[in-house]
Structure formats: structure tokens, C-alpha cells
């Protein structure tokens, strides 16, 4: 099974559990 980087996965499918999400241009992270 080929693996891809977290960045590549996020680019294709959006953020996944465990990724840090920055809300718009704020300093809030989820």
C-alpha cells in the first residue's frame, strides 16, 4: 500500500482528525 504525506492527503480530502486547523485569519486553532 502506497502512503502519502499528511499534506498531500489534506490537499485532496481536507483536514483529518489530528490536524491542526487554523480558523480563517485568526489565531484560533482546533
Curated annotation (Swiss-Prot):
One of its GO terms (molecular function) is metal ion binding. Coiled coil: none annotated. Pathway: Nitrogen metabolism; urea degradation; CO(2) and NH(3) from urea (urease route): step 1/1. One of its GO terms (cellular component) is cytoplasm. Induction: The probable operon is induced by urea. The keyword Metal-binding applies. It comes from the Bacteria. It is found in: Cytoplasm. Binds 2 nickel ions per subunit. GO terms for biological process: urea catabolic process. Its main location: cytoplasm. Its cofactor is Ni cation. Keywords: Cytoplasm, Hydrolase, Metal-binding, Nickel, Plasmid. InterPro entries: Metal-dep_hydrolase_composite (IPR011059), Urease_alpha_N_dom (IPR011612). Its EC number is 3.5.1.5. It catalyses: urea + 2 H2O + H(+) = hydrogencarbonate + 2 NH4(+). Belongs to the metallo-dependent hydrolases superfamily. Urease alpha subunit family. Heterotrimer of UreA (gamma), UreB (beta) and UreC (alpha) subunits. Three heterotrimers associate to form the active enzyme. This is Urease subunit alpha. It comes from Escherichia coli. The gene is ureC.
Amino acid at each position: 500500500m502506497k502512503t502519502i504525506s499528511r499534506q498531500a492527503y489534506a490537499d485532496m480530502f481536507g483536514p483529518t482528525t489530528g490536524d491542526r486547523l487554523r480558523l480563517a485569519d485568526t489565531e484560533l486553532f482546533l
